[in-house]
Amino acid sequence: MPLLRVSSCTSRQGGKGTFGGKRSFAWTTRFAFLKQGDVKKRAVLNGQKIVVVMPAYNAEKTLRRTYQEVMAQDIVDLVIVVDDASHDETVAIARTLPHVQVEVHPENRGYGGNQKTCYHLALAAGADIVVMIHPDYQYTPSLLPAMASLVASGLYPCVLGSRILGGGALRGGMPLWKYVANRFLTLVENFLLGAKLSEYHTGYRAFARSLLERLPIERNSDDFVFDNQILAQVLWLGCPIGEVTCPARYLPEASSINFRRSLRYGLGCLATALEYRWAKNFGHSRLFPELLAQ
């Protein structure tokens, strides 16, 4: 059974953030158990359009398998694959899949740049809920109904699939050094951001349209730290973030970044958290503009 964890923080002005009538309180954590079969049967999707986005780079070995499991959930209206100048057959495979919109970057724009295209295309396609999942088959698509229903019901505008909840990261093959770095970064970020997330570094996340439209994602990096910056911006709004425990699979063909880029990512995460703290004290910053917290 997936474990649900909810973390939230207060807004910059010190008031309580709200979404769908639910108040978000600082340093609040709640737990609940969800039976996956029950979630599918009673998913409160309210006729909302569910769009899954996949930022892809050299994903020919795992794209089709990920797509098939995504569509097997029977809730997805459209899949958008954005290829970031792959050198393999990712684009050719994507174009053979039904209900898939394919966008190709002629030049590599980076992981963050790819996500910007993903979210813009999803909103342009009329998505009410946007779920990002990597096409490398690291994350299980079977959690899509649970994550989408939590957003559709108005409970949480952002839901993460966490590899840390339930202790599945190491069992799934996460390298020990990455696990230790993940835990250290999360500890520091929670302190600086005033939240209680189990991790900030998952590539499995669902957003409400109303939230995505408010986030200034064009200000964010085109590199991997984009993932961290967008979550910090969600917290800046005072919005609650839900987490669902997600089994992880570290396959040989799955995408990964080397130690050097991981180090740069970690430093970028710390810089983002420090900028957030600076903005809380002095009013606003480049990533956290004044209008975001109004």
Where are these regions (language model features)?
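Short, well-formed alpha-helical segments that are part of the catalytic scaffolds
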Residues: 58-72
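Short hydrophobic beta-strand elements that form part
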Residues: 51-55, 80, 104
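Acceptor/aglycone-binding surface of glycosyltransferases and processive sugar-polymer synthases
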Residues: 107-124, 141-224, 251-260, 270
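Donor nucleotide-sugar binding loop of glycosyltransferases
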Residues: 59-62, 86, 140
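A conserved acidic beta->alpha catalytic loop
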Residues: 83-91
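Short beta-strand-to-loop acidic/aromatic patch adjacent to the donor-nucleotide binding site
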Residues: 127-136
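Hydrophobic helical membrane-anchoring modules
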Residues: 3-9, 27-47, 192-194, 218-294
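Conserved short acidic donor-positioning loop in nucleotide-sugar-dependent glycosyltransferases
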Residues: 70, 84-85, 109, 118
